[in-house]
Amino acid sequence: MGIRQAAIKILFLICISITSLAASQPLLNSEDIHRVMDRLFSLHIENRELSPTIIRRCFKLYIEQFDSEKSYLLEREVLPYLQISDEAAFAVIERMNNNDFSDFLMLNDMIQRAIARAQNMRHSNTIQMLDNDWPGAASPSAIQSHFAYSEKELADRLKNRLIRFYMFHKTRTDLSSTERKEKIVSLFDKKLRRQENNYLFLKANGAKMERKQIEHYFALRILKAFAKSLDTHSSFFSPEEAHEMRMSLEKQFEGVGVILFEGVDGVMISEVVKGGPAEQSGMIQTNDLLVEIDGNVLEFLAFEEVLDLLKKDNRREVVLGLRRIDDEGNPSFFHVTLNKRPIMLNESRISTSFEKFGDGVIGKISLYSFYESNDGISSEKDIKDAIRSFQKIGPLYGLVLDLRENSGGFLSQAVKVSGLFLSNGVVVISKYGRGEIHYLRNIVGRSFFNGPLVVLTSKMSASAAEIVAQALQDYGVAIIVGDERTFGKGSIQYQTVTDEGADIFFKVTVGKYYTASGRTTQIEGVKADIVVPTYYAPYNIGERYLEYPLSPDRLDPAFIDPLTDLDAKTKRLFQDKYMPYLQRVVSFWKKVLPVLRKNSTQRLAQNPQFQKMLRHQEQIRGRLEFLPPNSVDEMPATANDYQMEEAVNIVLDMIYLEQQSRVESAQAEEQLTGS
C-alpha cells in the first residue's frame, strides 16, 4: 500500500519492458466481468457472492474513482446510487447475473453529462480569472465532506482546484505574464481532460475509441470498483499498473532511467535515476525539457503519447532531444543516445551507517521494503551483507533496524528477515477464509545476529514490516521504538501481479496473519515498547482510516510449534531436527524495559529540539480536518533524526544493562562456588 498520497505532482518512472503490455494483453469485455468476479469470490476471506452491501459499495467506488474531490457531481445525482434500497440492489444483481450492466452504463452517462457541465464551467471560470487579478483565495484543502448541493457550489469547487493548481506551480516557475498564466490554465485543463477522456471514451488525441477499447475501459472500471468493494486491500489492475507494481516489488526495471513530470513548459526531466543510462551518459540534468524522441517532436503530443513513444518495444536504442536553459537564461538544444537496459533501484532498497562504540560499532540499517527478484536480490541478503560489513569494522555491539518508511512487500522475505534474529520457530501464522491454518517457520537453527536490537517503527510501517516487528517483539529479542502503533495491516492477499503469464491482474484478501503470540496486527498494529514519536505521529494514518477493513481477532499462541499443518513424514523429521532448537522467548529485555523507558523519557525531556517538534505536532493535530486520512504534509528537510538518535541511545542502554547483568551473574556464581 505505497500509503502517502501525492498532492498534485505526479511523477512517471519510465519503465520500458521488452514486450509491449498493450500488445501482449487481451482487452477486457463484459464476459470477463463475471469470470473475474467468480474468481475473486472463490478466493476472498469473507465475501462469496453479490449482495446489496457489495452493490452499494460498487456504485460508491465507481463514483469516487471518477470524482474523488466531489467537484463534478451533484448530491441529488449520486444519492440514488449511494442510498439504493435492498430491493433495487437485488434487481441490479439479477441484471448483472444475466450479463446486463446497464445500471453502470446509466451511471457512466451521468458522469459524461457532468463532464460536459464541468468543461463549460472551467471555460467560464478561466476567462473570468484571466481578465482579473490572480489568483484569489483558495480553501486549504481538497477534502469535501459532501457532494455539491448546487451548480454554483460546483463552479466554486472547480475554481478552487484551479487556484490551488496555480499556486502550486507559482512556487516552481514564473507565472507573471499573461502568456504564462494562459499556459497554466491550459495545463490544468489538459490534466483534467486526460481523466475525463477515459469516461468519454476518447483517446489521448481526442479521437473516439474503437468499440473494443470502449468495452475494455468500461469493464476495467466496473472490476476496479467491484474488487475494492470486497475489502480495502482487494484490487483489480490494468496490465500497465501490474507491471509498475512488479517492478516496485522486484526493485528493478528496464529502461533509460529518467523520471518525467508534465509542467507548464512541457515534459520535464524531474529526476535522473542513479546508475541508469541517463545518469551514466553525463549529459542529462533535472529540469531539462524533453522535446524530441527519435526525431518525433513532442510539442503537440499528449503526455500519454510521449510515454507511448518511450515505451515502444521495437528498438533498444532511444535518441532524446533536450532543451536546457542556463543560469543566464540562454537556451541550448542537444541530442542524447541511450540504450535501454535493466536498472537496479538500489536507493530505495536499503541504507546503512554506523556509530563507533569502543573497539566496535553500533549498526544502523534502514530497510524500505521487503523485496526479492529472480536475480538473487533480496532484503534478507542485503541485511546479511550489511551486518557482515559492520563486523569487518569491529565487533557489532548493537543494531538498529529502521522500518519507519517500510510499507511491506513479500511475506516470504518478512519470514527470512525475522529469521536473521531468531533460531527455529514459527514467525507467521496464516488463517484463511475456510478456517485453514498454516505456519510459516524459520528453519535455520542459529540466528545471524543476537545482540541488543532496536526496531524503529512508525505509523507508516505496514504489512510485512509489522510482521517482522511483532515477531521479534513476541520472542523478546528486540525493543520496538517509535510511534504508539504501526499502520495495522494484518491481512493476506493472493495476487497475480508477479505472474508475467497471467491474463488478468488482481490482488484479493484471502486471510489474515498472526505472529507466534497469536496476535494479529490487523487494525491495532504493533504497539511500541518505548514511544518516540516520528514525523507521522499526529496524522490520521492507519488501516482503521480505510474503507471496509477486516476486523481483528486472535489465535492460540504457537511458541511451541504444533506442526499440525505438516504430513506425517515431514512432522517426524521436524520433531527430530527442528523442535529441539526452537527459539525460546527472551525475558531479559522485558524485565529491564521500565529502566529503558525511564532513561529515554529523561533524555527526550531534556532535548529542546525534540520538545519543539512535539509542540509543532500539536499544531498539526489542530488542523487534521483539512487533511484526508492516510495523507501527510510534505516532510520538511531536517538534518536531525531524533528517533534514530534516541534508538542508538536505547541500544547503548541495552548494551550497558546486558553487561551489568553478566557481571552480576558472574558474581553470584562465584559466591555459590565459594560457599
Where do the PLM segments sit?
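PDZ/PDZ-like domain segments forming the peptide/carboxylate-binding groove
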Residues: R48, E64-Q65, D100, F104-N120, ...
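Cleft-lining beta-strand/loop regions that shape enzyme active-site pockets
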Residues: F41-S51, M209-H216, D231-F253, E262, ...
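Bacterial N-terminal signal peptides that target proteins for export
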Residues: M1-L11
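Polar, glycine-rich mid-to-C-terminal structural blocks
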Residues: A464, G476, D483, F487-Y539
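Acidic/histidine-rich, surface-exposed loop or edge segments in extracytoplasmic proteins
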Residues: I33-I45, E87-A89, N197-F201, L367-S369, ...
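Conserved functional hotspot residues or short segments at active or partner-binding sites
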Residues: W134, S139-P140, Q144, R164-E196, ...
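Bacterial N-terminal signal peptides
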Residues: K9-T19
